[in-house]
Swiss-Prot record:
CDD domains per UniProt: ASKHA_NBD_HSP70_DnaK-like
Described function: Acts as a chaperone.
Gene name in the database record: dnaK
Organism: Thermosipho melanesiensis (strain DSM 12029 / CIP 104789 / BI429)
SUPFAM superfamilies for the chain: Actin-like ATPase domain (SSF53067), Heat shock protein 70kD (HSP70), C-terminal subdomain (SSF100934), Heat shock protein 70kD (HSP70), peptide-binding domain (SSF100920)
Entry's Gene Ontology molecular function annotations: ATP binding; ATP-dependent protein folding chaperone; unfolded protein binding
Keyword Ligase: no
Family of the protein in this entry: Belongs to the heat shock protein 70 family.
Entries under PANTHER family matching the protein: HEAT SHOCK PROTEIN 70KDA
UniProt induction comment: By stress conditions e.g. heat shock.
Entry annotated with the keyword Nucleotide-binding: yes
Organism placement in taxonomy: Bacteria, Thermotogati, Thermotogota, Thermotogae, Thermotogales
Protein name: Chaperone protein DnaK
Coiled coil ranges: none
Length: 596
């Protein structure tokens, strides 16, 4: 019995469309057509009344007649606890996505005449831990061994990077898909592709452009006939299909005719929609949407510390980038034509296929030693004494990455510590996002500052975060995987970065105040300890003065009286030196007495 040949593939699991590709033994990459003969598969799943599950184009056709049982853009819900309820059964976003992946797998196996087990699947650069985990789970449910989850712009750069040799370049990937916008800046050279900055907006895409055409059509029709087509589900779906078709046509034509006979009916009889949409009208309807991509571009350039003229190449990803207004907009910002050599619909899947072939050691990938370097979008760290945020892995660090810092206890005799993990750019932990917490117990009682607790953050190549805390004295360790309950969109991430800039002065002041309180508390603790140990060597009046100062300082700390803390801290710092002097003098006097 002959066993079937096994293939490895790359998959672009998109919001609107999905694509599957493989690398041939001759190193060329082929996009695999689906059973309908198309190179892209709509990311749509429909449940027919008879219980059949339809995926792709057949499901898209159900949107009109069976809209309540048809699911599109499920990618937006990945990593959430959202459920799709069909009849009495609930489906998670992973399960719906798995139906799409299963179709891609089945159709590709038919086409290649073999078996597909291993795959690299892509996700937006801004997907957080929960969203990446969900993408991986969808792959597993669909029957794949998921070799790696990689960022879409990284994959696009990989598809592009293989045919560039020996030249270091700064590449900007402008990815405007059906539902999301991502911009990434990469460094390509010497077989290394490194993401140096990413930004975007995960609620901006081709769907929004379609919606503008739908609104215009509905408005014009209402003016002509006094009927609101948006009230009619079936009419609205026909408008949506017509809008998408018109948008695509206007990329190559200056005008398009939209004809929808029998769109609706009134008591007088049927009504037909006949309209002409020009490219200039389409541009005036959507110019502000294109303009919305400017800010993320500026943010990415700022993060990468680059100016537009520093960018060597601009790669376009996503069908929307075929729109002439978008290409002109990019040209206006960067002063150069975007590179159109990469097919915008297929680049991501092709890059994923290349990475899959490299990871699987496929024949076509021999000698191709590509290293993908992604970055973490926000700083990760823990809460320390006084509620301060102590960064452990800074924003835009390349992953995979592992970093550790050693901390200690804040109280005498402390036998456990709570490790609270935060993500964000603000110096006060509470202003950042709490990702999770866990306790390390069983620390032997000791004075504060003595135990040594090593906290380690480890981000793997899929961008999944593992945190551990280890008592270096006993070897006891506790770990957690960040579950990523906080689903951050690109807007959330950009807002976090902007807030950090906006509140910079205020945050700096608050941080300085907390640090002063911490230093004051440490000083009070030190003086207290010294008085207990050496009190008999210090004159009574000085001892009383120090005790009063310590009590006053602690009172000021409790009342958060910053001015008083500062004054008492400075005074206690001056008095502190006297303790040493008295101890030294007394010891000297004792030695002289012994020598006589």
């Amino acid at each position: 019995m002959s066993s079937k040949k096994e293939y490895v593939v790359g998959i672009d699991l998109g919001t609107t469309n999905s694509v599957i590709a493989w690398m041939k033994p001759d190193s060329s990459v082929e996009v695999i057509p689906n059973a309908e003969g198309a190179r892209t598969t709509p990311s749509i799943v429909a449940f027919s009344k008879s219980g059949e599950i339809l995926v792709g184009e057949p499901a898209k056709r159900q949107l009109i007649l069976n809209s309540d049982r048809t699911i599109k853009s499920i990618k937006r819900k990945m990593g959430t606890d959202y459920k799709v309820k069909i009849d009495d059964k609930e489906y998670s976003p992973q399960e719906i996505s798995a139906f799409i992946l299963k179709k891609l797998k089945k159709d590709a196996e038919e086409y290649l005449g073999g078996e597909i087990k291993r795959a690299v699947i892509t996700c937006p650069a801004y997907f957080n831990d929960a969203q990446r985990q969900a993408t991986k789970e969808a792959g597993i449910i669909a029957g794949f061994d998921v070799l790696r989850i990689i960022n879409e712009p990284t994959a696009a750069a990989l598809a592009y990077g293989l045919d560039r040799k020996g030249k270091e370049e700064k590449v900007l990937v402008y990815d405007l898909g059906g539902g999301t916008f991502d911009v990434s800046i990469l460094e390509i050279g010497d077989g290394v592709i490194q993401v140096i900055a990413t930004s975007g907006n995960n609620h901006l895409g081709g769907d929004d452009f379609d919606q503008r055409i739908i609104d215009w059509l509905a408005e014009e029709f209402k003016k002509q006939h006094g009927v609101d087509l948006k009230e009619d589900k079936q009419a609205l779906q026909r408008l949506r299909d017509a809008a998408e078709k018109a948008k695509i046509e206007l990329s190559s034509k200056l005008e398009t005719d939209i004809s929808l006979p029998y769109i609706t009916a009134t008591a007088e009889g049927p009504l037909h929609l006949e309209m002409r949409l020009t490219r200039s009208m389409f541009e005036s309807l959507t110019r502000d949407l294109v303009e919305m991509t400017r800010k993320p571009i500026e943010q990415a350039l700022s993060d990468a510390k680059l100016k537009p003229e520093d960018i060597d190449e601009i790669i376009l990803v996503g069908g929307m980038t075929r729109v002439p207004m978008i290409q002109n907009f990019i040209k206006e910002i960067f002063g150069k034509e975007p590179n159109k050599r990469v097919n915008p619909d297929e680049a991501v899947a092709m890059g994923a296929a290349i990475q899959a072939a490299i990871l699987a050691g496929e024949e076509g990938a021999q000698g191709k030693d590509i290293v993908l370097v992604d970055v973490t979008p926000l700083t990760l760290g823990i809460e320390v004494k006084g509620g301060l945020f102590e960064p452990i892995i800074p924003r835009n660090s390349t992953i995979p990455i592992k970093k550790s810092k050693v901390f200690t206890t804040a109280e005498d005799g402390q036998t456990e510590v709570e490790i609270r993990v935060f993500q964000g750019e603000r110096p006060i932990a509470a202003d950042n996002i709490l990702l999770g917490s866990f306790r390390l117990v069983g620390i032997p009682p000791a004075p504060r500052g003595v135990p040594q607790i090593e906290v380690t953050f480890d981000i793997d190549s899929d961008g999944i975060v593992h945190v551990s805390a280890k008592d270096l004295g006993t070897g006891k360790e506790q770990t957690m995987v960040v579950s990523g309950r906080h689903k951050l969109s690109e807007e959330d991430i950009n807002k976090i970065i902007e807030d950090a800039k906006k509140y910079e002065e205020q945050d700096k002041r608050r941080k300085e105040e907390v640090e002063l309180k911490n230093k004051a508390d440490d000083l009070a603790y030190y003086i207290d300890k010294s008085l207990k140990e050496y009190g008999d060597k210090i004159p009574q009046d000085e001892k009383q003065k120090l005790e009063t100062l310590v009590n006053d300082l602690r009172d000021a700390i409790n009342k958060n009286d910053i001015a008083r803390i500062k004054m008492l801290f400075d005074e206690l710092e001056r008095e502190k030196t006297k303790i040493g002097e008295y101890i030294y003098k007394q010891n000297q006097g004792n030695q002289q007495a012994e020598n006589q």
